[in-house]
Amino acid sequence: SSAASDVYKRQVLKGGSKSYVEKIIEGFQEKIFLSRPVIKVERSPSEVKIYCDKEPDPILFDKVIFATHSDQALELLEDPSDDEKSVLEALPYQKNTAIVHTDVSLMPKIKKTWSSWNYLLSGDLNRPVTLTYNMNILQSLDAKPDFLVTLNSLNEISPSKIIKKVEYSHPLFTVRGIHAQKKKSQISGHKNTYYCGAYWGNGFHEDGVNSALDVCKAFGVSL
């Protein structure tokens, strides 16, 4: 049900992904505004207007960078171009229910094949693959029992071993989407607008960071 004997060795951050987010925002934390949702973005050749919920006047900027999901960016744009519609619509997100639990029956029967990501196939081609992350491996947890996160599970998990359920949205990769990824230059950098997010790569945190670095390069900045 999962990886073979040649399990990849991964490097992980102590404290999980939260630790690198804290490091990245160290220099500008006071410029991050929470509980101030953006509801609309209007663009002109000379400026960008950002409208926030319950605020009558827009905030003016020279440029806008969308560090959001592709569908969220498209929804916020007041006047998306045909290229923006075509590319962003081809890179959709889908909702997944993530279940945090301790039921190791979702893991491979042979323990030495346990890996960070483990797939379970039902044989039903109309049913999505069940994916289980082993958090003990991913976050170097020295803990008992094994803490797992499973996506797209249909009743395989023992109810007594469920800790929490969370709704997430993840990139949905298709052949059309792979072609759309190659057209990023047609929309990012146009109309004073730039796009970054994990959907430009394979959906990993690293892909999100790499796409952000691409935007930095567009501004002549290297990190």
Where are these predicted regions, by residue range?
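Conserved flavin/dinucleotide-binding core of flavoenzymes
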Residues: 127-223
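Mid-domain catalytic core of redox enzymes
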Residues: 36-171
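Short active-site alpha-helical segment characteristic of glycosyltransferases
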Residues: 20
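A conserved beta-strand/loop element that lines the FAD pocket in flavoprotein oxidoreductases
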Residues: 27-38
